């Protein structure tokens, strides 16, 4: 239920707490179990209505950690409340930076470039659908797994996130995306020379611009729009390739 509620993390985004309202709302099912007393539950809910801003997919890791530490709060462990507040502050920055590298600068542009390359090589309309499915398959799996991973790690999550594996993975994804993007660019140029003319070149460059825009960090609203921009770019590329093959581009 917490992972499902995290889908609405940014629904009540505001300039005072950013994602704070959505974060606290997502925690409600867990807080309801841990704190049966309504007054105590309300007190703990208010404690989480503070500034929170992180990657929307990795934020569920923080939710799992918080619920694990809320067990200690419910048992009355000394200093548990202060420890929860401190760890949330650490995690929002750490998960935000890691999410930017893994998702916004890594997985999304790499997958978009790969889909564009397959489209130029002759893939059908299914390429756009495959891009959409693969992007969401990974990101939503991370969202779902994040709650249980965070809960299992508890306060030890800091050591897990400091593992160089995450940075190496992000760097490898960016490098792979750049290589595939270069291949897509070369194929697009070849497509234009094979008969696409100015119209084919214009369509191709417009598609590349959309893919580039989709790969940029555009703020909370833009990030939700970016996968759709990449999807649109892939569809346009498919259309351009079809027109060039049919000889309709002057």
What are these regions (language model features)?
Residues 1-80:
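Soluble N-terminal domains of membrane-associated systems
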Residues 80-86, 149-167:
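Juxtamembrane inter-helical linkers in multi-pass membrane proteins
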Residues 86-119, 178-185:
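Transmembrane alpha-helical segments and their cytosolic interface motifs
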Residues 116-129, 188-197:
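Helix-coil boundary and interhelical linker segments in multi-pass alpha-helical membrane proteins
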Residues 124-158:
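Conserved mixed alpha/beta catalytic, RNA-binding, or beta-rich assembly cores of soluble enzyme
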Residues 139, 143-147, 164-194:
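Alpha-helical transmembrane segments of helical membrane proteins, especially in multi-pass transport
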Residues 210-234:
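Interfacial loop-to-transmembrane junctions
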Residues 235-250:
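Juxtamembrane boundary at the C-terminal end of a transmembrane helix
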């Amino acid at each position: 239920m917490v992972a499902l509620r995290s889908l609405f993390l940014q629904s009540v985004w505001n300039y005072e707490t950013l994602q704070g309202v959505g974060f606290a709302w997502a925690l409600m099912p867990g807080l309801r179990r841990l704190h049966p007393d309504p007054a105590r539950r309300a007190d703990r809910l208010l404690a989480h209505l503070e500034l929170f801003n992180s990657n929307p997919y990795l934020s569920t890791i923080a939710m799992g950690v918080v619920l694990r530490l809320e067990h200690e709060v419910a048992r009355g462990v000394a200093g548990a409340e202060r420890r929860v507040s401190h760890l949330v502050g650490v995690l929002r920055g750490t998960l935000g930076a890691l999410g930017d590298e893994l998702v916004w600068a890594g997985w999304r542009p790499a997958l978009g470039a790969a889909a564009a390359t397959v489209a130029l090589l002759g893939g059908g309309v299914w390429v756009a659908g495959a891009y959409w499915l693969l992007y969401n398959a990974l990101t939503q799996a991370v969202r779902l797994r994040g709650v249980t991973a965070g809960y299992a790690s508890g306060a030890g999550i800091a050591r897990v996130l400091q593992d160089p594996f995450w940075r190496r993975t992000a760097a490898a994804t960016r490098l792979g995306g750049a290589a595939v993007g270069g291949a897509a660019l070369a194929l697009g140029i070849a497509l234009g020379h094979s008969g696409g003319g100015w119209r084919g070149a214009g369509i191709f460059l417009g598609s590349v611009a959309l893919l580039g825009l989709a790969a940029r960090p555009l703020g909370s609203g833009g990030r939700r729009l970016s996968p759709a921009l990449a999807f649109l770019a892939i569809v346009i590329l498919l259309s351009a390739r079809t027109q060039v093959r049919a000889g309709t581009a002057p």
